[in-house]
Amino acid sequence: MEAERRHRALYKGTTPPWKETYRKRCVERLKSNRSKLLDKFRQVGERIHGGVGGSFLVQEVMEEEWKVMQFENGGFPSMWKKDAFSQDPDELATLEEIKQELLLEEKAMVEEFENILQFEEQCFDSVVELSTGDQIVCPVCNRNYLTVTSCFIVCQCGVYINTQSQGMSIEKLHSLLESNLTAHAYHCNKLPVFSVATELGGAASLFMSCQECDAMVVIL
């Protein structure tokens, strides 16, 4: 009770001095939990609405950040225990305002994730298009089927890559193409291109590159 009185005295008749600090901390925590939010979003698939109040992380973020401020300032009551937090209309309105801002921030992040997942599907489809049964279309020329053995990969367009040390197979090559396309799609919404380049030692390697984000990855 005494803690609550001290807490209310902090901002009686004025804008709560903790409001901006709490708001900024909540926004920063929400953004720092980006990967966690993406994992939660993946788990629910196409169901846009998450947990409490249609949110994935907002309630959790607000609770965690309030606990930090409560630890730093003994004048803050326990927000989430029954009858522990003040029912002052101004105080509740402040919290609701912060919550709505966080919900909008989370919504923007979810929309971004939707675009990422949609692009990942497009990339997966492009890999599927490269594969027909036990065959893979050459990602360099996009016309001919590759001949894949444990020792080499070859295409009529001129692609020849020695894979003797890697023990290559159709399944392994498909997995490499899919995983690299998916990883690229996480941070860029443009489809990359594939090429073969000869290194200093004379060995040929398969590269995946993107002009949009300047990414370049050695696939083989």
Swiss-Prot record:
What's the protein here called? RPA-interacting protein B
GO annotation terms (biological process):
protein import into nucleus
From which organism does this entry originate? Xenopus laevis
Q: How does it assemble?
A: Interacts directly with the RPA1 subunit of RPA complex. Interacts with importin beta, but not with importin alpha. Forms a complex with the RPA complex and importin beta, which is dissociated by Ran-GTP.
Does the keyword Nucleus feature in the UniProt annotation? yes
Question: Where does the source fall among the domains of life?
Answer: Eukaryota
Q: Where is this region: Interaction with RPA1?
A: 49-165
Q: Where are the transmembrane segments?
A: none
Query: One GO CC term of this entry?
Result: nucleus
| Primary gene name | rpain-b
State the UniProt keywords alphabetically: Metal-binding, Nucleus, Zinc, Zinc-finger
ZnF (RIP-type) spans are 138-213
**Where is this protein localized, as stated in its record?**
Nucleus
Lineage, highest ranks first: Eukaryota, Metazoa, Chordata, Craniata, Vertebrata
Q: Where primarily located?
A: nucleus
Positions of region (Interaction with importin beta) = 1-45
Q: What does this protein do?
A: Mediates the import of RPA complex into the nucleus, via its interaction with importin beta.
Please give the InterPro entries that the UniProt record associates with this protein. Answer: RIP (IPR028156), RPA_interact_C_dom (IPR028159), RPA_interact_N_dom (IPR028158)
Q: One GO molecular-function annotation for this sequence? A: zinc ion binding
- The answer to whether the entry has keyword DNA repair is no
